[in-house]
């Protein structure tokens, strides 16, 4: 780890872990006309990659059918006049050009007018959350009053494309030590985190089993029903239930799974890593004053978003830097946060971030995370927003965060209303 990164880390972590409730918390709870608020946030079920309900459809189909359901549930003033939506941003990772053409087409087919501009975004695993930030920033600076953030991914149909996560063609870059680190497989970066920071296989399997147990319990209790919209498939069947969670998963049952990336001594397995998945999610945002004028419901409030860069070879540590940065930007501390939705790309990297920041495990992913639910890359950040707004209670504060391939981290803060 570079000296500069260590210095930044020390400053941010010390700031984030200060003692006592921050002075800024009460002021953040005050409602202002210029606030960016969330009017609606929903998602599809998450389908298992290559064999799940969405295996035979691609992202254009998923997005179009999701939008039909999502728009159909918009508050009447918006549903009656979609011209009020002034911008659409859609996160996606694996499609060529982040799906700029097919996802714009899906928006038009769903009734969003051609006069509403569209932008395709790809910041790898944070793409869905980056779309939320893109719309929020445009509202903040006065470019728009209402916007729609989306995230969609079909890992089934696009993950096996030639070089789906990019390539380096320049011979000069191929010889450059730092540049080559961007091509390190994600599983190997997680092995680096586990080895460098001494995250044991046992701890990883226990964390993963806990994720499965929480997700299966939440699914059985119907806690996801309010956030999941049904997707009608070409054969007429309906998918509206997550396919990843399963019963009777224990650390012991996971311990028998072989390492996936480093034979014999590796600790990363299919059981303690996120699932390859397909899914779509959407977040509708507005300026509070406009939402009030239109009598739109307010689920929560967007507060801030921050990203950081970290060494690509240990990219999973990203949230350990992004979370302190967004907390510092808002004057908050770790203990001010009621729930953390930290994407479980891998158990080792999630555990490192949780331990480094001194986060109470009971506050992390109370309904399970990507290990149990799945991680459709471009969808995940938007999905996490839909989830955390159901987990939080009135006036509680939540953080959504994830690591990002090639060495980054992102984090955002939301308040429930």
UniProtKB/Swiss-Prot annotation:
Spell out the residue ranges making up region: PTS2-type peroxisomal targeting signal: 1-15
Instruction: Tell whether Signal is among the UniProt keywords.
Output: no
Disulphide linkage map: none
Localization terms from the record: Peroxisome; Mitochondrion intermembrane space
Which catalytic residues are annotated? 125, 375, 403
Family matches, as SUPFAM superfamilies: Thiolase-like
Please name the InterPro entries in this protein's record: Thiolase, Thiolase-like, Thiolase-like_sf_Thiolase, Thiolase_acyl_enz_int_AS, Thiolase_AS, Thiolase_C, Thiolase_CS, Thiolase_N
Xref: Gene3D superfamilies: 3.40.47.10
EC nos: 2.3.1.16
Cellular component terms, GO, for this chain's entry? mitochondrial intermembrane space; peroxisomal matrix; peroxisome
Pathway, per UniProt? Answer: Lipid metabolism; fatty acid metabolism
Q: Where exactly are the transmembrane stretches of this chain?
A: none
Tell me the Gene Ontology biological-process terms attached to this UniProt entry: fatty acid beta-oxidation; phenylacetate catabolic process
What is the protein's known function?
A: Responsible for the thiolytic cleavage of straight chain 3-keto fatty acyl-CoAs (3-oxoacyl-CoAs).
Domain comment from the record reads as follows:
The PTS2-type peroxisomal targeting signal, which mediates interaction with PEX7 and localization to peroxisomes, is cleaved following import into peroxisomes.
What protein is this chain from? 3-ketoacyl-CoA thiolase, peroxisomal
